Amino acid sequence: IDLPDGSMIRLTIARYYTPSGRSIQKPYDSTVDYNKDLIERFNHGELMNADSIHFPDSLKVQTKKLGRTVYGGGGIMPDYFVPIDTTLYTDYHRNLVAKGAVIKFTMQFIEGHRKELANKYKKFESFDEKFVVDDDMLANLKEIGEKEGVKFNEEQYQKSLPLIKTQLKALIARDLWDMNEYFRVMNTTNESIQKALEILNSDEYQKKLK
């Protein structure tokens, strides 16, 4: 399937295995059980705290070469655990998104500044480095939110402010360029992505491959 950004998705029913023979997929014989498992893991705190994840000893296996402890049972426990950060997500932010205030603001802003943005930022790298979501833009967003029935909450607004700024910048980048640029902006606040990049560029990771 060809996608608008030039990438492609390939659907398959095949299973994928790591070099040590572990399937990266969980068993999904039952759709209900598969979805229920994710909900139970979230409620149990497994996505927020590594200490909440427990494996029975029967699933533990030592790799022959490096002697690392890995686990069977379907799916993979990562070598590095990055907890989900839920502090940025508030009801106020969710309502701004759900009521369409974020998209409406973005569309209005771009239509009012398209020529200016195109002339000022010829390349995404320049936009990424220099463009800043300022106070006037945020005030406009709050105003649109009020008109859409989203009651302003100062405490929740301050908590979600870093996410709101990143999201607005990413949506503007998407309109000016494409989805690749959208994710390049959004991923700056994605702790899993940032941790992965840190590890992949470290000597410690290279040692694990030997």
Task: Show which residues each predicted segment covers.
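Conserved phosphate-handling catalytic cores of large alpha/beta enzymes
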Residues: I1-D33
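Conserved functional hotspot residues or short segments at active or partner-binding sites
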Residues: S23-I24, Y28-K210
